[in-house]
Amino acid sequence: EPQRPAPGHPPPAGAVCLTGAQKPAACRCSRQDPKNRVNCGFPGITSDQCFTSGCCFDSQVPGVPWCFKPLPAQESEECVMEVSARKNCGYPGISPEDCARRNCCFSDTIPEVPWCFFPMSVEDCHY
């Protein structure tokens, strides 16, 4: 008979292997401008199928993909936003440390936009 873990103890690592991506955080979906959505599904996909593949689902806006790639993850949920929504919190060449001292977000992956920018409240984020 296979050995079972004692009650109250988790099974050994690797005993259960779940595949599939995780549902993205709400801000990564709701802050995406509908006109910038990149399709992530197929016609007739359900919200469950979409979320299972790590994508966002919103059927409220006609004429754009309902299952779409989320905005890039950031260190903090309040730093997730469209690049166009960034409000400058620093100066050209600011270091991540100086930006953090200002309690602002830092991302230097896109040129020609503020790299140090004010966070946004997560109150408005939803699926």
Swiss-Prot record:
GO molecular function: CXCR4 chemokine receptor binding; growth factor activity
Domain P-type: 27-71, 77-120
Protein location: Secreted
Expression sites by tissue: Found in pancreas.
InterPro entries linked: P_trefoil_chordata, P_trefoil_CS, P_trefoil_dom, P_trefoil_dom_sf
Keywords linked to the UniProt accession: Disulfide bond, Growth factor, Pyrrolidone carboxylic acid, Repeat, Secreted, Signal
Main location class: secreted
Modified positions (Pyrrolidone carboxylic acid) in chain numbering: 22
Superkingdom field: Eukaryota
Function comment: Inhibits gastrointestinal motility and gastric acid secretion. Could function as a structural component of gastric mucus, possibly by stabilizing glycoproteins in the mucus gel through interactions with carbohydrate side chains.
This protein's name: Trefoil factor 2
Lineage: Eukaryota, Metazoa, Chordata, Craniata, Vertebrata
Gene from which the chain derives: TFF2
